Amino acid sequence: MRISLPTVASTVREIAIDASVYDNKPSVTIVEIMGRHAGWLTAASVLARKFEGDNPVLIYLPEVAFSPDAFIEKVKEKLTKTSNLVVCISEGINDGNGTFVCELASDVGTDTFGHKMLTGSGKYLENLVKEKLGIKVRSVELNVCQRCSSSCLSATDLDEAAASGRFAVSAALDGETGKMINFIRKSDDPYILEFGTADVNEICNKEKAVPEEWITKDGSDIGDEFIAYARPLIQGSVEVPMKDGLPYFAFRK
C-alpha cells in the first residue's frame, strides 16, 4: 500500500490540473481508486491538495456508509463554490449494509479467493451525476497503475522496505518462524518507526481499516489525522534509473 501513496496523490493532482481547464462550465471528474474494505489509497488523494478547498474536494472511503442521494446533494453544494469538481472514491464504497455501489449497476464476479471483483463504482456515479445534474462528467479508474508505477517513489518507503528486510533476516537467523514483520509507529512528529514481528495467522487475509475518526462526520472528506500519518511516508525523492527516455527495470529472461 505504502508505495502507492505518492503515486495516487501525484496522479490526482495532475487530474485536478487537467480538470481546471474547464472553468467556463460546471464539470465533475470522479476518480475510482483501489480499496474494497479499506480506503488507505483513496485517503492518500487528500495529499494532492495545495491549499484548503483545493481538489479533490470530496473523498469517499468504504469505512463509512455511502448514500447516492447525499452524494448528489454534496456535489450540487460544492459546484456552487467551484466549477470543476474532482471527487475521489474507493472502489468498495457501500451502503453500510453489505451492498457495494457498483452492484447497483451491474453483475459482479468473484476472484480466486471468493472476493467480489469490484469495478464500476466510478462509472455508476458518473451516470448518476449525468442523470441527476445534466452536466459534464467523466470517471477515471487508476487501476493497476496505482500499485505498479515507480515514477513517484518515496525515499522513506524504500529505506524502510530495505530495513524491514534486514530485520526479517535477523529474526529468521534468531529462529523465529511463521512470523511477519510489522511496522510500529512511535511518533508522527518527529517521525519515528520501529519494527517488530507478529504471528502470520493474525495478519493473513485480514484488513486494517482507516480509523473512522480520521474521516469527517458526513463521510465526504479526510481529516488532519490521516495527513499527519501519511505525509512522513512520502518524504524524499528517488532517482529512477532511465534508459532511452524510459524507466529501466531489472527483469528475468
What feature does the model see in each segment?
Residues 1-138:
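Accessory alpha-helical/coil subdomains and C-terminal extensions
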Residues 103-253:
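C-terminal non-catalytic interaction/assembly regions of soluble proteins
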